[in-house]
Amino acid sequence: MNIMRFEDNVKKINDKVWQSKFSPVTLNYRDIEQLENHAKNNNLRQFRYCLQTNNKDNLQQMLIFHSYPQVINWHCQPIGGMVFYYVIKGQIDVILQQEETKIYKLADHKYSNKEFNSMISIPKNVYRRISTNSQSSIFLEISSGSFKDSDTVWKISMKK
């Protein structure tokens, strides 16, 4: 079986976003480490590697790298569907705003404390805020539906 090298399957959208050229996509630890090093070596606050080959695909799969602690402001996609987060490295909080604010602490398997989960699945129309609490974090975001920046609603604050 002829397996494609990771480097041969990368389409560089810009410095902060790379995408797979072909499917199926396979990544090993070395590939993920190479992506993380790209983010760190280029002083990128955030870096995203999209596993889908097209933003119009019905399933969006993104490896997201945060190079240092940071907060992604409140956002949602009112068109609906689901979004799933899985922490590969580090610790993040996913803060949800529904009737009340709820904080879900997610972490990789090294955080053996039972306070932490490693994954969460939530409706896309719920406002959420992502807070990276470790020096660096890597997490997988899987979202139903195609992706357009204009489908995301952003808020700086949830205060009325």
Q: What are the residue ranges of the model-derived segments?
A:
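A short, N-terminal "cap"/entry segment at the start of jelly-roll beta-barrel domains
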Residues: 1-59, 105-112
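Short, solvent-exposed secondary-structure boundary motifs
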Residues: 39-43, 53, 74-76, 118-121
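A short beta-loop-beta micro-motif enriched in histidine and acidic residues
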Residues: 51-60, 70-86, 115
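Conserved hydrophobic/aromatic beta-strand scaffold that supports enzyme active sites
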Residues: 61-65, 84, 119-121
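Glycine- and acidic-residue-biased ligand/ion/polar-headgroup-sensing regions
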Residues: 67-68, 79-100
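Short beta-strand His + acidic residue motifs that chelate non-heme Fe in jelly-roll/DSBH
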Residues: 73-75, 94-96, 120-122, 128-133, ...
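Double-stranded beta-helix
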Residues: 99-115, 129-160
